[in-house]
Amino acid sequence: MWIKSVCLFATIAGCLGQRGGPYKVPDAKLEAIYPKGLRVSVPDDGYSLFAFHGKLNEEMEGLEAGHWSRDITKAKQGRWIFRDRNAELKLGDKIYFWTYVIKDGLGYRQDNGEWTVTEFVNENGTVVDTSTAPPPVAPAVSEEDQSPGPQWRPCERSLTESLARERVCKGSLVFSEDFDGSSLADLGNWTAEVRFPGEPDYPYNLYTTDGTVGFESGSLVVRPVMTESKYHEGIIYDRLDLERCTGQLGTLECRRESSGGQIVPPVMTAKLATRRSFAFKFGRIDIKAKMPRGDWLIPELNLEPLDNIYGNQRYASGLMRVAFVRGNDVYAKKLYGGPIMSDADPFRSMLLKDKQGLANWNNDYHVYSLLWKPNGLELMVDGEVYGTIDAGDGFYQIAKNNLVSHASQWLKGTVMAPFDEKFFITLGLRVAGIHDFTDGPGKPWENKGTKAMINFWNNRFRWFPTWHDTSLKVDYVRVYAL
């Protein structure tokens, strides 16, 4: 099976891209520019990146970086162009190379390229007769167009691990999503969930794609929608079976029926995951996002365990929150991020880090980052570190002291257990639930109340007027190797 993941080759070598599949990278056009310079190009076919790696008069050893190693992120006049204005070539020189493109979120290579200099051309591509050509006039060069000369940048193996990667190079970009599409079909790396979420947080929403996902100015948009607006008034007191359910069929993940104080979740939102395409262990994830505004909304910018090695309940296998900000104005100046290893406080939030903002965090876009290392975590926002978690001798003892029964499972792993396995990325939006908001004045439900969800719904006249800018907007997601 083709694994739909992205392996970018920014200043690296040896990081293996994905092969197989029907798409063929077009042949690269190489040109020796008179009196000096090299130009390499391919026609644009909807790519999001073009990379060129080559060596002069020396064969490539597999997927090494080469003397030339350059990623191009923008096409010009219908072509993706690599330019080295300082390359001094002569007739008979031979360039060995490979190219790499990203198309629809997938990476493709053209391997074993060879090209020999048989002629020189002007900047406009016309052939130059070097025996009669006048001294050239150097064109004006913008700083953006300048390219460094050949450099050797060998691959140093990273501690980062990724699905379908035999080798990951230090500092390499191993996943990238810019949300430049216009529909979910354009997101090859993501799968949308369609299900009723349950334990351990029991939020008051269901996940679907019906009206809850969109795209705006290059950003993914996840918005809350009233369930009754999709179905009919009173559906929350009825029964709802989800078509195309991605949860476990025949369970409460796919079917809900109102009974007593329990109702069908009154709000629909969305959640997207890379579970089927990309997961990694150790690295740095950057998410540029604008948080939602509105009472009792919770953004989900998370890393979730791929295999639940240490258990699949009560966060026994861990959850890493890259960032979250509660949507209520009274809470929105405080940013949180970090690990969760239990469903209940005090240990649930004990290791979370926070940062007080001068203004509400949901006023604008920010870059939220989590650095995941073999011995701890760091939380950052806009490049500034606001929290560190040192694993020390492991999390078992502190969890045991806080009566976390599943902590003994972590003794099977390393000091980072349960965060020593692969995790995948999730982006979504949650509503209320029983753990993220403490009971108190102004909160229309009690977390342990038997009628919590219906009390939340019956008080919609209090919270719904605050839902003006409720969308979670994500500009990009990037994962870098250590």
From Swiss-Prot:
Record-annotated GH16 domain positions: 128-482
Gene Ontology cellular-component terms listed: extracellular region
Keywords, in A-Z order: Glycoprotein, Immunity, Innate immunity, Secreted, Signal
Tissue occurrence: Cuticle and fat body.
Keyword Endoplasmic reticulum: no
Domain CBM39: 23-122
Compartments, as annotated in UniProt: Secreted
Keyword field contains Membrane: no
UniProt cross-references to InterPro entries, sorted A to Z: BGBP_N, BGBP_N_sf, ConA-like_dom_sf, GH16, GH16_GRP_C, Glycosyl_Hydrlase_16
Region (Disordered): 127-153
Pfam short name (any one): CBM39
Family per record: Belongs to the insect beta-1,3-glucan binding protein family.
Function: Involved in the recognition of invading microorganisms. Binds specifically to beta-1,3-glucan and lipoteichoic acid and causes aggregation of invading microorganisms. Binding to beta-1,3-glucan activates the phenoloxidase cascade.
Complex formation: Monomer.
Protein name: Beta-1,3-glucan-binding protein 2
Organism: Manduca sexta (Tobacco hawkmoth)
